[in-house]
Amino acid sequence: MVAFLSMYQIMVSAQCYTADQQQSWLQKAEAAKPTIKKTIHHPLQEVSIVKDVEAFQGYKAVKVGDIKDLYIQSFKQKKEVVVDFGEHLVGRVSFKIKDIGGMQDAVLRFKVTFGEVPSDLALPVEPYTGGLSRGWLQDFICDVSYDGSFQFSRRITARYMKIEAIGTSAYSDFCFDNITFESTTSAGLSKVKLADSTPMIFKDIARVSENTLRDCMQGVYEDGPKRDQRLWMGDLYLEALANTASFQQYDVTKRCLYLLAGLANPRNGLLYSNMVEYPTPHAQNSFFVDYALSYVLTLDDYLKATGDVATGLDLWPVVKNQIETVLSQAIDQNGLYSNTSYQYPGMMFSTVFFDWSPVALDNHAAIQGLLVYTMEHALDIAKRIGTTAEVKDYPAQVKRLRAAGKKAYWDAKQKLVLSGKEKQNSYTGTSWAILGGIISGKDAQSAIKNVMRNPKAIKPGTPYANHFLVQAMLNCGLKQEAKDYVEQYWGGMVRLGADTFWEYYVPDNHLFSSYNGYTLLNSYCHAWSCTPIYFIVNYPEVFQK
């Protein structure tokens, strides 16, 4: 089935990258480590979390009392409080208490819970059914000794903080003296200046986009500062696009590109899907084909923004390895990526992701389009760094892959992209068929309009997939449709009170979670939702009028 496999096996019998080469990449990543900026915040108001069927996930925060009372009135009598910092923050939290009756004569015990959104403090924690570590939840038992101070040992991501006194002395009394949230980010000042004519909803969407990216920009581009606190390659591409449009902190992008290269599989040259920065940078041993290809897109965006040819040349072998491994191992004699379950030798686990979906998503059309799209970006990189001779066969291969994809997945009669043996119609398959040029012009416009009319079509499950749908709309000239979609989807989160954009937003099911339905594991500041700022800045004729 697979062309050139034996040739590839011979090629990778030796190391793709030397130990010295990868060590050099890791050193360059360390040299590009950004400065972390810190800002001190204090609670702005005391709130109560109340039920509201119209609110996101059925709960909202309502101002009660005066925040000043927290620092003068007995907390032993009050017993419980929820404070609001006024915005979504990432960083270190500490608090102090002071005696207002007899001196403290016993350790004080508190239960403290942090929430990104009001429902984080209202939904039941137990029984825990989430598919990931319960340690991601931000609920703590805190013992305050005689010095009256406490600092959380781990980084916190939250807007709201609930404090409950669960162990106090009968012989002393106390109030809070100080509650401090020291926020962190590697983002600087935004370079965005929107036209005065920009509709308010898009100004708000741009602001929330920047907030999302700001809080995800730490030592690397994290996917979510609450959970998972790691660099995923798919998120990296979208964060890099948003950064180029806003903060322009290119050292973060450069660091991430070098970290991933330095941690790649040295024998086959493939990039692992994600890496964790602490305690020392290390990769998780999984291979997402679409994410590995997105590395090429990220490097191309970085080169366009910075003109850093030296980095482009340095990482060029990584670019070629991702593309040529896929071409040599996974493309059949008909020019199709025909087995999306293919397991790449040397990788513990291989998959094609594209989106979380409640219904199994067929990714054949999507991966075909992405491969073509990636090869075109690789050609752009080659032109910038002077390596076009190494990819002189790419244009012919692109033509072949496009033709194969159109023959296999384009139903010219119905004007639909139909993926795989089951002929599945999905927004994601349609988006990537357009982005990869498998269909274009009027056909592309018809494909988007028809998939959106099809009640059986598989809709996007995440902001990640929705980004590429909007890009496909813009690429084929459906500018008003793109504008409306951003306003409805990301604007929907804004209207529900989002400070930062969420990991999931399913308009007709606010409690959706891919973690066995356990909503408290969801992230409410997630990198793959930060890209409206990219659209708003780069398409002013669409979004700033």
PLM features: residue spans?
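Bacterial Sec-dependent N-terminal signal peptides
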Residues: 1-16
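Extracellular/oxidizing-compartment recognition motifs
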Residues: 15-223, 235, 251-254, 271, ...
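Short, surface-exposed recognition loops or helix-turn segments adjacent to catalytic cores
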Residues: 223-224, 228, 535
